[in-house]
Amino acid sequence: ENFINFKKIFIIMKLIQTPITDDVINDLKVGDKISLSGKMYCGRDAVLPKLSRSIIDGDTDKYPFDFKGMAIMHTAFSVAGIAPTTSNKTEIESSIPTLSSAGVKFHIGKGSLSEKTKEELNKYNSVFIVCPPVAALLTNNVVSKSCVAYKEEGMEAFFELEVRDIPGIVAIAHGESL
């Protein structure tokens, strides 16, 4: 197979399979290196606020997915592939608490988050994972993709990906951060 084996690069990694459970989160600590496989979702500035609004309004039945145990990477999906965008953009960071309250366990991106967001992640037993912004390598580990919400947003629509061995480092967990 043509997948990049990030486990060889990161040496000691915790292998995580979606959906992510509270037991998995409870076992993670800041600085842990992870390798994520299974379903991962992609969204950023355009769709994350819309998803948050749907959660607040109690209007999530229209989606063909469940937020519980979900991993969301802060990225669009384009012909160039996937790579995390800066997670502390207002539209993205402000959506993290609401998405976590609905069951999202991994928020994957880059950059730092506010103290308030760190507290909200802890409240909902969710974590922030930083991921290397290496589009070619990450995209190589996408097995399949499908647009599952907000198709009108084009490459910034909400995509469901099947991924294998997406690397990351736990940057915020249990009220602690790097």
Walk through the language-model features, giving the residues of each.
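Active-site/ligand-binding-proximal alpha/beta "capping" segment
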Residues: 95-97, 169-178
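Short, charged beta-turn/beta-strand-edge "cap" motif at the junction between a beta-strand
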Residues: 22, 33, 39-43
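Feature captures the catalytic cores and cofactor-binding loops of soluble hydro-lyases/lyases
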Residues: 42-43, 47-166
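Short, Lys/Arg-enriched N-terminal segments with co-localized hydrophobic residues
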Residues: 1-12
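Short, structured beta-strand/loop micro-motifs enriched in basic residues and often containing a Trp
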Residues: 13-20
